[in-house]
């Protein structure tokens, strides 16, 4: 199991500063080592916390042309729909950085508009396998699952991550790379998501949480409570939890220091 680090910040601004530095440092590392940097985004508040990457020194120093962008989960809708994680990321981040359009891998727009969750999941898995064959995505040494360089994740108050929800069968999927959901307890009901083995094969996983509403689930997940999807999070190299004081308020004393 990869080491788990916990970093608690006094303000969201301080967290955004450190998240930008962490991401930029890994970008530099992987661009030098591999010539590409594979990044997996999530929805929710995560995109808003990437704003420091849009400023100096990062906007001009990051090798954006070597980034390849994927999603840990997506709502089954058209790209321009208000529920779309792609739209959220594009409007708030991707439209402001020079990542080549051909390096951005969103859900199939037509299948999203049709609401075909099962086929959309199959197509996205096919896309990932194509990128593995093109040596853009590596595969994990023992399992053959895709291995992304960095995943930027968030967690819901119920402890869900991606579109893996407590009590859902999808959390136990061990073969598929991407699976579909048609009964999400959080609207919209139709989604696709990377499976837990794929999420846990990433080299680096960041979990960013800023809300007192999530404090109980943060404490439970960091205690590796297995009925919470976020409690099963690991990685190949390391997992880092970026938390504000409210989200960390239920952690045992001494588990982490405030930065």
Swiss-Prot record:
Record keywords, A-Z: Cytoplasm, Hydrolase
Pathway(s) served: Carbohydrate degradation; pentose phosphate pathway; D-ribulose 5-phosphate from D-glucose 6-phosphate (oxidative stage): step 2/3
Gene Ontology BP terms: carbohydrate metabolic process; pentose-phosphate shunt
Known EC number: 3.1.1.31
Gene3D superfamilies: 3.40.50.1360
Location(s), subcellular: Cytoplasm, Cytosol
Cellular component annotations (GO), alphabetically ordered: cytosol; plant-type vacuole
CDD domains for the chain: 6PGL
Main localisation: cytoplasm
InterPro entries assigned: 6-phosphogluconolactonase_DevB, Glc/Gal-6P_isomerase, NagB/RpiA_transferase-like, PGLS
Deletion consequences: No visible phenotype under normal growth conditions.
Pfam families per UniProt: Glucosamine_iso
Role played: Catalyzes the hydrolysis of 6-phosphogluconolactone to 6-phosphogluconate.
Protein name: Probable 6-phosphogluconolactonase 2
Gene that produces this protein: PGL2
